[in-house]
Structure formats: C-alpha cells, structure tokens
Amino acid sequence: MIRAFDQLSLPLLRWLDAEDAHRLAIQGLKLLPAVKPRADDAKLAVRAFGLNFPNPVGMAAGFDKNAEVPDALLRLGFGFVEIGSVTPRPQSGNPRPRLFRLERDEAVINRMGFNNDGAEIVLRRLAGRANQGGIVGVNVGANKDSADRVADYVRLIETFAPVASYFTVNISSPNTPGLRNLQQASQLDDLLTKVLEARDRVRRKAGDTPVLLKIAPDLSLAELDDVVHVARSRGVDGMIVSNTTLARPNSLREQMRAKEQGGLSGRPLFRLSTRMVAETFVRVEGAFPLIGVGGIDTGGAALTKIRAGASLIQLYSSLVYKGLGLVESIKADLTSTLLRTGRESLSEIVGADAATITAEDWPV
C-alpha cells in the first residue's frame, strides 16, 4: 500500500507548489484504508518518557499541524506522531510563498509562521480519536501577537493534557519573531517553571503527561550549557534536538533558492543537528532521553543519530524526497543492524559515538 501511494503521489506532488503538494498529501492520507499496521520487531521497541514506543521512528511536528491524519500515519508504520505546532488562537501564518524545495540538496526552507486551526478545533479532532491508541504528541507554540507568550504555553498544556501522549514546548521555531529568545536562561526558567506547574495541576485528570523541550541547532555551546542546566533543574522529561537552522552551508547547490528566509531542514541539516544531539547527550548525563531530528534520510543516518545520543528519531523533510516507504526502510535497516551485531535493543547503542562526534575531528 505504501509503495503504491509513493509511486502515485511523488511524481505528481513534485509538479505542484510545495505547500499545495503538502495539502494534497494530507488529503490523500485521509483516503487510505484503515489497515492495521504490520507488527514491529520487538527489538525496535523503546521505553522513554514513561511511554512504550513500538519503534523509534516518529513523524515530526509540522507535517500534520492540525491533527487531521495522526492515525493514518500510525498505520503507515510510524512509532509515534507529533502534531502541531498548535497555538491558542487560530492564525494564518506568514504570507505565501513560505515553503520552498531545494531539490538538488534534498532540503526544504520554510517560514510558515505557526499557521494552524487553533486549540479549540485541534482539541476536538484529538478528542475524537480518544480510543484509537498509539502515541500522539502535541507540539505547542505561542501566537505571534500574544501579549504573554508564557501564558499561551500554560493554556495549551491545560487544554491538551487529557488527549496528549506527550507535550513538546516549541521555543525554537525561527519563523515567529522573538520566540527563540525564550531559550535564554532566565526566560526559559520562568517558562518551564510555569509549564510544569500547569502539567502538575491537571495531573489528577490527565495523568503525568511528559513535557519535552525542542531546541534550535544554532545555539552556541555556552547557550546549550544554560538550556540543559535549566531543563535538568526544572525537571523536563526530555528534549528534541533539533529544529530547523538559519544557517546556509556553503555546500548548498541551490544558492539562489537558499537566499529565501526561513528555517532550513533536510539533508544539509544532518551534520549540524547530529553534532547538537551529541553535545546535548553528554551534557544531559542520562537525566532524560533525547529525540533526534534533522536530515535523517536512510537507515544509516538514523543509526548515526541514535549513536550520537538519540533514543528516538523523527522524520519530515526526507519524506518529501524519499516517500513514506522510508519509514519501513529505516526500521528494516535498524533491525538488520541489531541482528548483525547481536544486540537485543537500540538502547544498547544510544550515545555510543557521542564522545567522538563532539570531538574536534567530527566537524559540522
């Protein structure tokens, strides 16, 4: 089914404007039959944040912003899905065009600006799938015109606690002016204190929903020191490393398209984000797990991200170029690696190469 979907959709979608193609992909997923997914190899199971993931491959936030197709994605083999980013009130985001393919680089630049249907509508959709099962996280953000962004995050935690498998506090999108300032130590401390207090207030009716922090790959190591210190001190359950980058590597082939403003994702982000995973892993010192994101487009890339320190991984931009069949391909490669090396689970290799990657001889 997945192969047929890719064969039919990928050539067509390439001819469309990137955002129109994304919209068509969402509509196509709504039409897929509700077929039970193939059971994953037990070796791929991951226990993290108090949750049991059937496999480590997740759909990153940004694809299903409005919780329209989380169950279709789970049926296609993802171990978990992260919807959003969601803001308290609906917002249209930045003007189009705002999504660009760099095809020769297998990359994407976006300046979407947290366009979404708002908390009320997204909550209704998630509540409607309450008995479906599967891990569906909610990525939360602040409205662009908010007078109190911390209050936005608190409101979203309280709103979505009954339906979220976990929360991602997104303070690292480059497309909302000033949002990344929340990564500064004093502001981050205040934000996480209030977010975790909100989570604790609703614990009785919603359970102990994990709260993760998503960071940018463009932090300096000193800034990363501060972020990890605050995250550990306040007791977050995990971190997602990383969001898109504002950097433009000299290696990009599509230099004219690379001049578009926004966050760069896809293959050119791989080394930068993997280095940031490793740097975060050594600073976290096992206090909580990490999800690695950025440029994962093969089983080998997934393995590298895991060995850098990621317990779980997420995909998005690579699916634009490789199709949804990439999910099963990565899982098959990871299973083969475990069998070949005689290991029982991926947890045995998480962070195995972190020290090497953080060394000077593993340049970005």
Curated annotation (Swiss-Prot):
Chain segments annotated as coiled-coil in the UniProt record: none
PROSITE patterns, sorted: DHODEHASE_1, DHODEHASE_2
Record SUPFAM superfamilies: FMN-linked oxidoreductases
Compartments where found: Cell membrane
Chemical reaction(s) catalysed: (S)-dihydroorotate + a quinone = orotate + a quinol
Cofactor dependency: FMN
Transmembrane regions listed in the UniProt entry: none
InterPro entries, sorted: Aldolase_TIM, DHO_dehydrogenase, Dihydroorotate_DH_2, Dihydroorotate_DH_cat, Dihydroorotate_DH_CS
Family (UniProt): Belongs to the dihydroorotate dehydrogenase family. Type 2 subfamily.
Listed name of the protein: Dihydroorotate dehydrogenase (quinone)
Provenance organism: Bradyrhizobium sp. (strain ORS 278)
Lineage: Bacteria, Pseudomonadati, Pseudomonadota, Alphaproteobacteria, Hyphomicrobiales
Gene that this polypeptide is encoded by: pyrD
